[in-house]
Amino acid sequence: MFTSINPATGEEGARFEALDDDGIEAALARAEAAFRSWRVSEIAQRTALLTGIADAFEANKQHLAETATKEMGKTLASAVAEVEKCIAGFRHYAAKGPGYLEPVETKAASGRVVGHWLPLGPVLAVMPWNFPYWQAVRW
């Protein structure tokens, strides 16, 4: 069991069940299954989803910031700034992402090389959580 504790007050917040080995394997399997369908989705679907997430963050900015403040001890101003950075990030990738995924052609000694961006699949990362929302956006 994990319990969120407000570092400023010591007050207990939400509680979360820890995953056992089977729970971890099930979560990884769900991530892999989601990847298989996501990797063949249309770019328009992806950009619409990113825009929708940005809109949801915008609509819930104060709540998200207050949650980060309670769970991490961040100042409210810092938490709001992080949420706003995430909104900008989602909107940036919705607008510019399709261009980033275009094939890249380069001259080579033997002619030309065309690079294609291919999905990697689920990424498991151990990262510091001083910017919890941004961690999800930047990956």
Stretch-by-stretch model annotation:
Residues M1-G111:
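N-terminal Rossmann-like NAD(P)+-binding subdomain of aldehyde/semialdehyde dehydrogenases
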Residues V104-W139:
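Conserved small-residue-rich beta-alpha loop and adjacent elements
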